[in-house]
């Protein structure tokens, strides 16, 4: 009798412990599920006047698997009538710094600045950022490896602009853009390959090397195998593009500056001479085609080398024109 009572009590006690443990586990699992949901939701704060922050943008379409942190600043005032500036980072992918370059100027001149970060996970190497995924391998282009335009990294920019317009109820129908170093590479190719975009003014500062509108030189350095039509090129020449160079950006051994027999013989050994070559050759191409040429080479920035903050300060006047 005693043994039966003891066995019953032991079973009852185990049932209580089991129920308690299951209940505790349910709570833990529920908590983990809630945390996972919270972590997977895009943490986005509405774009309000007078704010500095970051949000995550997910493009639609062929690049919907990509994720872009967008660092931004808005001045105080009516956002609906403020111009929109995109600031494109270089190879360091430090988009926060490229936003910060513009904060004071944005406040003083009443425009919004957005600096998208093309992270190295979703946009690895120069193929996905500097060369915008135009080809599967930008250094070995062919008609067979040409990606469709909806897979080009360029295709994200107008989408992002439309998203910002929606979030701010903006009345703007176009945007301006500034890029430095790798960002200037991305931006001048954006003008070449997507002249139909909503971009109004592009300021390209201190690009390391260029896709030059030059026949007989293979892409990514020239037009050969570029799959860039004359009609696109003519439209690109009609856009407003500033070639913006620091007079001291002359170090041929600068970090990440591309060197090979093609680009060195074609464009020169440093960023300054390469920028000059890009502009002069582009101008000659437009003259050869007898078409409108709205590209402008600005005065070279005195006392400044490869410095994005100083170049941004000088670029302001061209953004405001």
Predicted regions span which residues?
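A domain-start/cap signature at the N-terminus of enzymes
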Residues: 19-84, 96-97, 108, 149-152, ...
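Serine-hydrolase catalytic machinery in alpha/beta-hydrolase-like enzymes
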Residues: 59, 66, 71, 80-174
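Bacterial N-terminal signal peptides that target proteins for export
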Residues: 1-7
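C-terminal catalytic histidine-bearing segment of alpha/beta-hydrolase fold enzymes
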Residues: 276-321
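Alpha/beta-hydrolase
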Residues: 86-88, 205, 301
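Bacterial N-terminal signal peptides
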Residues: 8-16
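Short beta-to-alpha linker loops that shape the active-site pocket of alpha/beta-hydrolase fold enzymes
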Residues: 117-121, 208, 304
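The feature captures the conserved acid-bearing segment of alpha/beta-hydrolase catalytic domains
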Residues: 200-284
């Amino acid at each position: 009798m005693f043994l039966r009572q003891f066995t019953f009590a032991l079973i009852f006690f185990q049932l209580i412990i089991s129920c308690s443990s299951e209940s505790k586990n349910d709570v833990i699992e529920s908590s983990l599920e809630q945390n996972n949901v919270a972590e997977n939701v895009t943490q986005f704060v509405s774009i309000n006047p007078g704010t500095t922050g970051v949000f995550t943008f997910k493009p639609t379409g062929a690049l919907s698997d990509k994720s872009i942190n967008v660092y931004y600043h808005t001045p105080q005032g009516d956002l609906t009538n403020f111009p929109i500036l995109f600031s494109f980072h270089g190879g360091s992918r430090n988009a926060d710094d490229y936003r910060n370059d513009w904060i004071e100027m944005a406040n003083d001149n009443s425009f919004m600045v957005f600096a998208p970060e093309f992270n190295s996970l979703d946009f690895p190497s120069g193929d996905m950022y500097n060369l915008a995924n135009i080809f599967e391998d930008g250094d070995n282009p062919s008609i067979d490896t040409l990606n469709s335009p909806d897979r080009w990294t360029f295709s994200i920019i107008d989408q992002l602009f439309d998203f910002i317009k929606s979030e701010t109820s903006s009345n703007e129908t176009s945007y301006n853009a500034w890029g430095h170093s790798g960002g200037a590479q991305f931006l001048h190719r954006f003008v070449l390959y997507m002249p139909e975009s909503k971009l109004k003014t592009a300021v390209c500062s201190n690009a390391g090397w260029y896709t030059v509108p030059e026949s007989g030189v293979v892409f990514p350095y020239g037009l050969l195998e570029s799959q860039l039509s004359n009609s696109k090129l003519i439209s690109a020449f009609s856009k407003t593009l500033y070639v913006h160079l620091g007079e001291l950006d002359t170090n041929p051994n600068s970090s990440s500056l591309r060197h090979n027999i093609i680009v060195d013989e074609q464009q020169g050994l440093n960023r300054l001479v390469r920028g000059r070559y890009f502009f002069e050759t582009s101008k000659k191409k437009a003259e050869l085609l007898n078409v409108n040429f709205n590209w402008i080479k600005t005065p070279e920035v005195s006392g400044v080398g490869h410095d994005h903050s100083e170049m941004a300060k000088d670029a302001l006047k061209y953004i405001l024109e």
